[in-house]
Amino acid sequence: GSTGDGYALARAAGHTVTPIFPALVPLVTREAWVKDVQGLSLRNVRASLCHNGKKEQHFFGEMLFTHFGVTGPIILQLSRRASELLAAGVQELSLHLNLKPALTHEKLRDRLDRDFAKYEQKHLHNGMMDLLPKCLIDIVLSAAQLSPDSIVGHISSKQRECLVRTLQALPLTIVGTRPLSEAIVTAGGVATREIDPRTMASKLVHGLYFAGELVDVDAYTGGYNLQAAFS
């Protein structure tokens, strides 16, 4: 970390400094249920960031629930765009989690029907044990407006369709990011058009050079940002 004085010094030298905001940063959700599953790590899921019904970005991989929201590799990758939109004044964003991205809607429905045939006389919560981590089952059922105490055999075809849709787009509302002090990378900085890329020298002030986070360069992982600084 740093004091951030470099940005003020760059401005004083006449340089343009683009808006600063956290990137590669955990996201804060409105939903309180994340606290009930904090510490739960999911692998092979797809997270999609949406705004006004439009999918902004999506990434496949691992994520982690926390007491404040979500983090992990795919969340950090999405966070740059989320943070940019929030910094621009967007009040909230939608995050859709596809918990079974390897299956098409039809194949997931077939899988659900097979499980439900096997657990026909059991409560719905127990009928989902082969599909989801135990602590996540009731959350998904609630999002699909289903009771965990319902009998599996009583779940209608329409309700099953709703459950499949929920499994492939479990909704979360993004209302913020963790503070800049917790971010891996800072987005924004001294405009690259004002820097000579061969020497990193200022095009405006002789003898002034820039490097690292001070420059308006960032990417999806910390490794890329380290390489940019070293280069």
What is each model feature region?
Residues G1-A13, V217-S231:
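A conserved FAD-binding loop/helix module that cradles the flavin
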Residues G1-S2, V28-A32, V152-Q159:
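Short beta-strand to alpha-helix junction loop
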Residues G1-D5, P73, L103, K107, ...:
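Conserved active-site and cofactor/substrate-binding residues in soluble primary-metabolism enzymes
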Residues D138-D218:
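A glycine-rich dinucleotide-binding beta-alpha-beta segment and adjacent secondary-structure elements
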Residues P26, V70-P73, V185, V215-Q227:
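Glycine-rich phosphate/pyrophosphate-binding beta-alpha loops
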Residues H15-F21, V25-I151:
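An anion/pyrophosphate-binding glycine-rich loop and adjacent beta-alpha core
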Residues Y7, L24, S94-H96, L124-D130, ...:
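Domain-scale detector for complete catalytic domains at protein termini or as standalone homologs
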Residues G1-T3, L9-R11, M63-F68, L208-F210:
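Short hydrophobic core segments
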